């Protein structure tokens, strides 16, 4: 009875792809952080100019 053995890869041979993916993920995270900071800065500017109108725009009229 002959038995055949097959060797399965454990997925450890593609370190270069993992590094590329990690770098891309870090770049995306930095971009999202910058976009979030820009949005928060824009909101701060609006609030500094006219906070009353900003709040009034988001408060429902008539207590509803």
Swiss-Prot record:
PTM field: Is modified by deamidation of its C-terminal glutamine to glutamate by the deamidase Dop, a prerequisite to the subsequent pupylation process.
GO molecular function: proteasome binding; protein tag activity
KW Coiled coil (keyword) present: yes
Keyword Transferase found: no
A Gene Ontology BP annotation from the UniProt entry: proteasomal protein catabolic process
Sequence segments annotated as region (Disordered): 1-36
UniProt modified residues of type Deamidated glutamine: 64
Region entry ARC ATPase binding, spans: 21-58
Keywords associated with the record: Coiled coil, Isopeptide bond, Ubl conjugation pathway
Coiled coil: 26-52
Spans through the membrane: none
Crosslink position(s): Isoglutamyl lysine isopeptide (Gln-Lys) (interchain with K-? in acceptor proteins): 64
Pathway the protein takes part in: Protein degradation; proteasomal Pup-dependent pathway
Similarity comment: family membership: Belongs to the prokaryotic ubiquitin-like protein family.
This protein's domain notes: The N-terminal unstructured half of Pup provides a signal required to initiate unfolding and degradation by the proteasome but is not needed for pupylation, while the C-terminal helical half of Pup interacts with ARC to target proteins to the proteasome.
Function of the molecule: Protein modifier that is covalently attached to lysine residues of substrate proteins, thereby targeting them for proteasomal degradation. The tagging system is termed pupylation.
Record text on subunit structure and interactions: Strongly interacts with the proteasome-associated ATPase ARC through a hydrophobic interface; the interacting region of Pup lies in its C-terminal half. There is one Pup binding site per ARC hexamer ring.
Protein name: Prokaryotic ubiquitin-like protein Pup
Phylogenetic lineage: Bacteria, Bacillati, Actinomycetota, Actinomycetes, Mycobacteriales
């Amino acid at each position: 009875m002959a038995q055949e053995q097959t060797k399965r890869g454990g997925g450890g041979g593609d370190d270069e792809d993992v590094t590329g993916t990690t770098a891309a993920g870090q770049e995306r995270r930095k971009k999202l952080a910058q976009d979030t900071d820009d949005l928060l800065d824009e909101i701060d500017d609006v609030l500094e100019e006219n906070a009353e109108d900003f709040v009034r725009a988001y408060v429902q009229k008539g207590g509803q």
